[in-house]
């Protein structure tokens, strides 16, 4: 089974448990925090990946981290389970998948809006409102400036791209002119 499939299984199960406990958001925050710690600390990742350290040593390190970060029993149990099964390295993907499932459950989308020039707050809000109206979901928009677009905007929602950039329009015109 692929790492991505494994991550999705753990994430989906945890979202279901979080939903039942009313803790979806807090679980997400805890997973994100621990995942960032694991990703940012090479030494910590090395300890968990190194077979020279026994499982008991790894458990002790995990218990200390869980206590220091004040993680919930559910997340603590998940981390211990991943440690026992040698899958702690999958945690960043579990965290990412969990976030996606949690957003789906709560009706949130997180599109990326790229523009050639910085947009005014009113323009961003207008786009956010239009996306919310067309999708029927809460929109948490990530705004980026990409000078290569020249002008216009590109919106990415999941796997879909809505490209209204000047760069793309110029490329289309060039293509039409070349084809005759």
From Swiss-Prot:
Renumbered to this chain, the signal peptide range is none
Alphabetical GO CC annotations of the entry are:
plasma membrane; proton-transporting ATP synthase complex
Its keywords, alphabetically, are:
ATP synthesis, Cell inner membrane, Cell membrane, CF(1), Hydrogen ion transport, Ion transport, Membrane, Transport
| Highest taxon of the lineage | Bacteria
This protein's membrane topology, according to the annotation, is: Peripheral membrane protein
Q: Which Pfam family is an annotated match for this chain, by its short name?
A: OSCP
Give its localization: Cell inner membrane
| InterPro entries registered for this protein in UniProt | ATP_synth_OSCP/delta_N_sf, ATPase_OSCP/dsu
What terms describe the molecular function in GO for this protein? proton-transporting ATP synthase activity, rotational mechanism
Indicate the quaternary assembly: F-type ATPases have 2 components, F(1) - the catalytic core - and F(0) - the membrane proton channel. F(1) has five subunits: alpha(3), beta(3), gamma(1), delta(1), epsilon(1). F(0) has three main subunits: a(1), b(2) and c(10-14). The alpha and beta chains form an alternating ring which encloses part of the gamma chain. F(1) is attached to F(0) by a central stalk formed by the gamma and epsilon chains, while a peripheral stalk is formed by the delta and b chains.
UniProt function note: F(1)F(0) ATP synthase produces ATP from ADP in the presence of a proton or sodium gradient. F-type ATPases consist of two structural domains, F(1) containing the extramembraneous catalytic core and F(0) containing the membrane proton channel, linked together by a central stalk and a peripheral stalk. During catalysis, ATP synthesis in the catalytic domain of F(1) is coupled via a rotary mechanism of the central stalk subunits to proton translocation. This protein is part of the stalk that links CF(0) to CF(1). It either transmits conformational changes from CF(0) to CF(1) or is implicated in proton conduction.
| UniProt protein name | ATP synthase subunit delta
